[in-house]
Swiss-Prot record:
Keyword tRNA-binding appears in the UniProt entry: no
Source organism per UniProt: Leptospira borgpetersenii serovar Hardjo-bovis (strain JB197)
Primary subcellular site in the record, as a coarse category: cytoplasm
UniProt binding sites for substrate: R69, G70, G71, D72, F73, T74, A75, H76, S140, I141, G142, G153, V154, A155
UniProt protein name: Octanoyltransferase
Active-site residues annotated for this sequence: C171 (acyl-thioester intermediate)
Keywords, sorted A to Z: Acyltransferase, Cytoplasm, Transferase
Reaction it catalyzes: octanoyl-[ACP] + L-lysyl-[protein] = N(6)-octanoyl-L-lysyl-[protein] + holo-[ACP] + H(+)
Protein's GO biological process: protein modification process
Domain of life: Bacteria
């Protein structure tokens, strides 16, 4: 399985096109990337959690799009590392619950090793939260399992400015519940980001099997 890191920000709609092609040919890979500012609503979205009108937001450079993934509204923006595993669960004989639990555990272990952060899950609200303050969310999750081939994934807040998050109640919560590595006073620079990605590769490898060398691309 290839791991690909994009050096340039990938438009969200471009990613949606990519994921459909990957699913069609059941081509496994794991993508690491950032998006330009966008708000997305999952299949369980509550309209009241979009605090400003779609037309106004788009006039401010924040796109709004509705997608086939679990969850409510969330946001993507520069400074947030998005990890999209595309995994053939049928071929690998992996139960959905096992996949989700191990995906989150990979993030938990990688964050602990990289920054000494202790993160926990919340059975009532998907994502990862600080163990020291369980109201503070640092990682969002939303996955699609169409045809037992995964798409979408997790979004980990490194040093994003939360401009897009201010326009929603992310997953029904107040945007001020969101935090990031930078807001916690920790190093969110390039070297630490690369270290986190390396640990993610190792942890994903532990339950998905052999993963090839990380590939960098500018497309």
């Amino acid at each position: 399985m290839r791991m690909i890191r994009f050096r340039k920000k990938i438009p969200y709609l471009r990613y949606l096109e990519m994921q459909e092609k990957l699913r069609k040919f059941r081509r496994e890979c794991i993508l690491f990337l950032e998006h330009a500012p966008i708000i997305t609503g999952g299949i369980n979205y509550n309209p009241e959690n979009l605090l400003l009108g779609k037309e106004f937001l788009e006039s401010q450079g924040i796109q709004v799009h509705f997608v086939q993934r679990g969850g409510d509204f969330t946001a993507h923006e520069p400074g947030q590392l998005v990890i999209y595993p595309h995994v053939d669960l049928k071929k690998r004989n992996l139960p959905i619950r096992f996949y989700l639990e191990n995906l989150l555990q990979s993030v938990i272990d990688s964050a602990r090793t990289t920054w000494g952060l202790n993160l926990i899950t919340d059975s009532d609200s998907p994502g990862l939260y600080l163990e020291s303050n369980s109201s503070k969310k640092i990682c969002s999750i939303g996955v699609n399992f169409k045809s037992f081939f995964t798409s979408h994934g997790v979004a980990f807040n490194l040093n994003n400015d939360f401009t897009a998050f201010r326009c929603i109640n992310p997953c029904g919560r107040n945007w001020t519940d969101m935090t990031s590595v930078e807001k916690l006073g920790l190093d969110s620079g390039f070297a630490k980001r690369n270290q986190f990605i390396s640990f993610m590769k190792a942890n994903l490898n532990s339950f998905l099997g052999p993963i090839s060398k990380l590939t960098h691309t500018v497309i």
